[in-house]
């Protein structure tokens, strides 16, 4: 594999409905793996790749990122697209290596991972059964560089954001939603009284949404 990653595999025999889960800046491949047993009773296979770039997160501490921090300037779109190419290769390797139900492959991204998820899903919407973006936004500079497929109009999309988010203000998510609706994505947008995080309430909503849009059968979270 070209990217370090962790995996949660349900009991039983596959192929399994699968979530490709992309972490935020400063985190690692373990960060979101704990969501797997909490989503629809652990029925999803979850694959969590690690961003290819090391980034300092404190004295003597290192995390990982998908692209460099812009320090208030526009995002480095070239770096985003470079990491997207790595993810495209990673997905192909995963499809060849793990018991993935290709018709039930969902994409989930948190924060910087959400930016990467937009880049992947808007370009290759037919590859994914659903897109969930948490505490993130779609940079205009990135959107301008994407060749957005008309197939996005059939991609169920969930966006969750905290009204108290100090890192990515909710207005950035709202602006992204407006632009995504112009692309005619079938989109659900939910705001929560939370910061830059996932809460029990937002997790319950995410689980129910994945059940409806991907599993199509009753499951418990």
Mark where each language-model region is.
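C-terminal catalytic histidine-bearing segment of alpha/beta-hydrolase fold enzymes
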Residues: 170-221
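Serine-hydrolase catalytic machinery in alpha/beta-hydrolase-like enzymes
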Residues: 1-100
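Short, conserved loop/helix-junction motifs that constitute active-site signature segments
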Residues: 38-41, 148-154
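Short beta-strand/loop motif that positions the catalytic acidic residue
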Residues: 158-161, 165
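Alpha/beta-hydrolase-fold catalytic nucleophile elbow
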Residues: 50, 108, 134-135, 160, ...
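Primarily recognizes the serine-hydrolase "nucleophile elbow" in alpha/beta-hydrolase
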Residues: 103-152
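Short, proline-enriched alpha-helix->beta-strand connector loops that line the catalytic pocket
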Residues: 152-157, 183-185
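Conserved alpha/beta-hydrolase "nucleophile elbow" surrounding the catalytic nucleophile
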Residues: 23-25, 108-110, 162
């Amino acid at each position: 594999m070209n990217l370090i990653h962790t995996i949660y595999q349900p009991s039983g025999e596959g192929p399994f409905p699968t979530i490709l889960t992309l972490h935020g800046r400063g985190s690692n491949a373990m960060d979101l793996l704990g969501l797997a047993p909490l989503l629809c009773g652990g029925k999803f296979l979850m694959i969590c790749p690690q961003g290819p770039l090391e980034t300092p997160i404190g004295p003597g501490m290192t995390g990982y990122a998908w692209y460099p921090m812009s320090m208030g300037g526009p995002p480095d779109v070239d770096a985003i697209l470079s990491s997207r190419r790595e993810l495209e290769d990673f997905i192909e390797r995963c499809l060849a290596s793990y018991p993935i139900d290709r018709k039930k492959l969902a994409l989930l991204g948190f924060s910087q991972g959400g930016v990467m998820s937009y880049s992947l899903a808007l370009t290759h919407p037919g590859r994914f059964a659903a897109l969930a973006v948490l505490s993130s936004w779609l940079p205009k500079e990135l959107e301008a560089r994407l060749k957005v497929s008309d197939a996005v109009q059939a991609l169920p999309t969930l966006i969750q954001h905290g009204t108290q988010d100090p890192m990515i203000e909710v207005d950035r998510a709202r602006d992204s939603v407006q632009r995504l609706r112009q692309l005619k994505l079938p989109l659900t947008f939910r705001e929560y009284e939370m910061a830059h995080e996932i809460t029990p309430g937002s997790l319950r909503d995410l689980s129910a949404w994945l059940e409806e849009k991907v599993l199509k059968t009753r499951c418990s979270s």
